[in-house]
Amino acid sequence: MPRFAANLSMMYNEHAFLDRFAAAAADGFRAVEFLFPYEHAAAELRARLDANGLTQALFNAAPGDWAAGERGLAALPGREADFRGTIGRALEYAGVIGNDRIHVMAGLIPADADRARCRATYLENLAFAANAAAAQGVTVLIEPINTRDMPGYFLNRQDDGQAICKEVGAANLKVQFDCYHCQIVEGDVAMKLKRDIAGIGHIQIAGVPERHEPDVGELNYPYLFEVMDTLGYDGWIGCEYRPRAGTSAGLGWLKPYLGR
């Protein structure tokens, strides 16, 4: 049976961030995820989780200067020291909050960049991150992201993500499979899930093409949830979408899966 985590960076924007935990729990969610925890004390976030009976599925390591347009550091030559600092901080937060998944963003690469050098940097940084996280029982995730939403992002395809994980060779390095990004970049989502399930550490969903609720758009999510069940996926499914109107009003798709 699929288990869903509300993405508090995109959902429940009707509420102040710290109030989104209670709102998600009231709608039946038992887990949450979000992009970055670092504007709040880890202990405060843990208190919100505990007060509402929620599990933290994952969050991201800091991506560099998000406001300046940075979208990760892992594949950026010359930023290795900055990257390592983000891993240490993310693991400190995870140690308090209790999540066992951290997403590490690759970064934006100029069109004329030396991609081989960027890839070598990426592999080295991911090996460092996985080694540091292993001591804490944490899995590091990398996510192929579509270039329509994020032009220049280094990692775009599922097969490339899987190949990178295999090349690094760390048991706690896996792919964060976002059905939305996969559909936009390459399609054939069900077959990609079947092919790659052993290397998938987290799944996310959203309607395609506008990233609204999963019951809107071209993907048949009830079928994909059946595929995930058949494959034995028992992790959280992150709801990383932008509600068309009120978050709670758009949760009709979720109701059949609550209490099953």
From Swiss-Prot:
List the active-site residues. E143, E240
Q: Which reaction does it catalyse?
A: 2-dehydro-L-erythronate = 3-dehydro-L-erythronate; 2-dehydro-D-erythronate = 3-dehydro-D-erythronate
Gene Ontology terms describing biological process: glyoxylate metabolic process
Loss of this gene results in the following:
Deletion decreases growth with L-threonate or D-erythronate as carbon source. Deletion of both otnI and hyi abolishes growth with L-threonate or D-erythronate.
* Entry EC no(s): 5.3.1.35
Q: Which InterPro entries match?
A: HPT_OtnI_isomerases, HyI-like, Sugar_Epim/Isomerase, Xyl_isomerase-like_sf, Xyl_isomerase-like_TIM-brl
One GO MF term on file is: hydroxypyruvate isomerase activity
| Residues engaged in binding Mg(2+) | E143, D178, Q204, E240
Keyword set, alphabetical order: Carbohydrate metabolism, Isomerase, Magnesium, Metal-binding
The UniProt entry's sequence similarity note says: Belongs to the hyi family. OtnI subfamily.
Q: What does this protein do?
A: Catalyzes the isomerization of 2-oxo-tetronate to 3-oxo-tetronate.
Spell out the protein name for this chain.
2-oxo-tetronate isomerase
Query: Which species is this UniProt entry from?
Result: Cupriavidus necator (strain ATCC 17699 / DSM 428 / KCTC 22496 / NCIMB 10442 / H16 / Stanier 337)
